């Protein structure tokens, strides 16, 4: 039997939902473990739906710790984005679900250490609201939070390191430093620049820090998160001041901060909405250059999630998922990924296609290859408009130029313009390097 609407509605009560049964089974398993003489301590890790179940049993069973991966409630808000400003109106069944079953309602009663892991651009959970649940967790317990920032909705290596260290501390009783969360404030400095002030754990040795930001508030799973690393000069004591260069015509932006410490434990802040109230000195101009390896490194591209290998549709196979830079002809770098490259910059105001624009790009491959270029105009990336080119192996970089009419769907429809594109994907049948993607 399928759970259907019972996953986000309590019809007629919580007892009639699948959650009630799943939580009952999990509580029974915990009770069984607690009666075993050889078990001195146990915890719970839940992936996606399993993470929601863990929240529902944590207040009632003696867990040593809990880890929730890509799950922290707000299921009744499915399809209702946080930052659109729309008023949320619910029927009685949804209200009952929020009060009796949604994980954020259980968070204040959790009494064991908690690690929450989330992934930006994930379409299967509400990552915008995960930190709202984190803030509601019982303040008396140790807790930590981390966004995985691949841009393809999958959990990466920093999160896996956090899992290992968290379990070492709370199940194996090892001496492991677990950091407090990162605090973030966005303000104007004395020069008239917009900056992010990031406050880190003063008791920790910082290894790396920075911010991620996007100017796209809607289409939560199709955002381009630009990373800005903090330099040593940016850090004073436990506060880093990092420049935040927002597109001059953007009225709002989303920002979060991250820190990686010397023991490899990482944490992030909440996603903070920033209202751009005035023009700032360091505002950015409109850019026709969507991606340049020299300028962007790996900002602006990531592994394409639709083709990415993963474990439980949750943990990334980093070798096949992550974008990487490799040298092509003349030592010039280009981006590639086994899963294919995706860029959500075409969905960002700063990089969106001008009227009647054409697309130009450079590509290189050591051997003969085919390259498919795909545009999606829907957030679910279901209907593809594609064009294909053949790349002769070796030699110099090859330049290609496309008009909108060159891109066709499987039924032969073509697009009239690149305006309102959500994502741009590059898929090669060999290791094809991409560089200098721009509108002309």
Model regions and ranges:
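Short carbohydrate-recognition loop motifs
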Residues: 314-343
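Catalytic histidine neighborhood in serine/cysteine hydrolases
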Residues: 137-154
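Short beta-strand/loop motif that positions the catalytic acidic residue
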Residues: 110, 116-118
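Cap/lid segment of the alpha/beta-hydrolase catalytic domain
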Residues: 1-24, 73, 78-82
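Extracellular carbohydrate-recognition regions
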Residues: 279-320
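Primarily recognizes the serine-hydrolase "nucleophile elbow" in alpha/beta-hydrolase
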Residues: 28-90
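Surface beta-strand/loop "capping" patches
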Residues: 168-213, 229-237
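Extracellular ligand-binding interfaces
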Residues: 334-412, 428-433, 438-439
């Amino acid at each position: 039997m399928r759970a259907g609407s019972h996953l986000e509605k309590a019809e007629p009560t919580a007892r009639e939902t699948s959650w009630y049964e799943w939580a009952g089974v999990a509580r029974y398993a915990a009770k069984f473990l607690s009666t075993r003489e050889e078990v001195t301590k146990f915890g719970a890790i839940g992936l996606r739906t399993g993470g929601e179940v863990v929240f529902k049993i944590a207040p009632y069973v003696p867990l040593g710790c809990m880890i929730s991966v890509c799950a922290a409630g707000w299921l009744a808000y499915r399809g209702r984005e946080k930052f659109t400003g729309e008023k949320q109106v619910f029927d009685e069944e949804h209200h009952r679900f929020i009060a009796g079953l949604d994980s954020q309602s259980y968070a204040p009663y959790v009494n064991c250490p908690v690690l929450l892991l989330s992934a930006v651009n994930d379409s299967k959970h509400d990552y915008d609201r995960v930190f709202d649940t984190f803030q509601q967790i019982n303040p008396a317990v140790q807790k930590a939070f981390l966004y995985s920032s691949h841009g393809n909705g999958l959990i990466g290596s920093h999160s896996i390191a956090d899992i290992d260290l968290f379990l070492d501390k709370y199940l194996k009783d090892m001496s492991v430093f677990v950091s407090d969360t990162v605090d973030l404030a966005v303000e104007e400095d004395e020069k008239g620049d917009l900056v992010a002030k990031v406050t880190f754990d003063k008791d920790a040795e910082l290894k790396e820090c920075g911010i991620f930001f996007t100017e796209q508030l809607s289409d939560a799973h199709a955002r381009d998160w630009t990373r800005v690393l903090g330099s040593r000069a940016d850090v004073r004591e436990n506060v880093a001041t990092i420049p935040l260069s927002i597109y001059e015509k953007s009225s709002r932006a989303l920002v979060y901060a991250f820190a990686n410490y010397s023991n490899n434990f990482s944490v992030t802040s909440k996603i903070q909405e920033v209202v751009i109230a005035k023009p700032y000195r360091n505002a950015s101009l409109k850019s026709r250059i969507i991606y340049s390896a020299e300028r962007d490194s790996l900002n602006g591209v990531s592994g394409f999630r639709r083709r990415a290998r993963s474990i439980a549709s949750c943990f990334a196979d980093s070798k096949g998922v992550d974008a990487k830079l490799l040298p092509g002809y003349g030592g010039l770098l280009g981006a590639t990924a086994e899963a294919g490259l995706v860029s959500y910059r075409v969905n960002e105001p700063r990089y969106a296609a001008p009227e009647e624009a054409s697309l130009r790009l450079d590509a290189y491959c050591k051997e003969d290859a085919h390259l498919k270029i795909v545009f999606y105009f829907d957030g679910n990336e279901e209907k593809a408009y594609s064009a294909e080119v053949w790349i002769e192996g070796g030699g110099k970089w090859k330049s290609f130029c496309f008009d909108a009419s060159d891109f066709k769907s499987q039924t032969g429809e073509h697009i009239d313009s690149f305006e309102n594109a959500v994502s741009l994907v590059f898929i090669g049948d060999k290791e094809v390097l991409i560089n200098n993607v721009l509108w002309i």
